[in-house]
């Protein structure tokens, strides 16, 4: 009797183990079948990349960067989501041309919605930014396990403005990032000095894509200025020498002076069209200079010490343009407005390749 009981218990134990094995096999087969079905229904599921940047608001550089990065990431075969706080102003362009995600709080974002997070370029590392730690170092995603990296962060000035507390937090949060890159050459040494980390230089996102994308973006824009020949002026701030030069240009040249005002919903189209169709550009804007280069327009740029000159210094170094930047005490020659723009395409292409390879590496698509 005792032997029978032992045999019966052993039989039940073996049967239980067998059923467990069958259950595990069933689950494994079911999972494989489910993944097979998912792949069959969606064989080319794209990598979902959350692109964190400054607030969605009316700003030329901010919005063009978002557009350009979205285009570049799509060219690399991933699915970008342009994430930012929604101010409800001036976002028509990027709302129409990107996968825009407008939020009111970073807590609205879920790790399961994205495969990778990246900090986009522009002044995302400028210390006065609202929601600075969440934008600059992705603090809201501190415990997320997906890969994170920084593309082309700018500190916006010629000096490092992080406090000791912020330096400590940056080190803590950035240590698990797969890559750190900056938009100005001079920032590399600050990252090493204050964060003890390595960073590389990459191009502003607007320089990554072909100008054909910008021309396509304005192909339906109808409000082109009704002047055959004009010189475009684009001012961020009042600079005495710049105003003086503009007035001299008005008096001595026969060209119409078009002082572009970005005060309507189509301000990005107006900006792109204005530079593309002009004879020359007078500006104190970083992106005013970059788009003069993109559209190959002669330009004169005035430095603004309050905004920092590191961005212009980097352009001079990388693009090989030395003679078109002027401080408050120097007066440019009018001849520059008619002197063809010369820049080093070989160097630009070199850094463009480095920038795109950096993206590929951190997106794990090499």
Annotate the PLM regions.
Residues 2-366:
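Active-site anion-handling motifs in enzyme catalytic cores
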